[in-house]
Amino acid sequence: TRPDGHTPPGFNLELTRSVRDAVRTATDDRVLVVAQGSIVDTDQAEWAITDGIADAVEMTRAQLSDAELVAKLRRGEATRIRPCTLSNQRSQVRDNRNPIVSSLGDPFTGHETEDQPVEGTALHPRDVVVVGGGPAGLEAARVAALRGHSVTLYEASDRFGGMMRTAAKGPGWARMDLLADWLVGECRHLGVEL
């Protein structure tokens, strides 16, 4: 099984450092070492490379969570990268039990051949009201704004995120708060009135 939110991100980095040191000595630094093991934050990945722990970093689940991860980094938009929750809900190897490899935080991952929300595609932009600032409401507001609509999001409580905030309190689910914060941040970035 893959490590999930119960295991700290980057849990293999010290082992990787030991392997890299041994490989460097044994091969006169001719073999590259790739770090892996729940590395889902770009800051941690960059640190692993700059600190000499590894020559490269594998970030599969991070890229399932945000297929534009590399492009956003290149554009200087690291704060806009959708975080991986390490939930393992949809990111296991594709088989008959899990026919689509996807991400809990990105409903479009795994459905790349279907229509994707494209920025500014609304033929007739409208005023859209979304009631409820939980995960579904935040995502609906985000996608509507991406498509060019003017969106207002109403939430009865004093905090957006709904049940993601509750889930984040459970063992292994703390990263759900990061996803809720990202959704709120994206809504703000896209001009959604909160």
Residue ranges and their predicted role:
Residues T1-V131, P135, E139-V151, R159:
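Flavin-dependent oxidoreductase catalytic cores
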Residues V130-E193:
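Beta1-alpha1 glycine-rich phosphate/pyrophosphate-binding loop at the start
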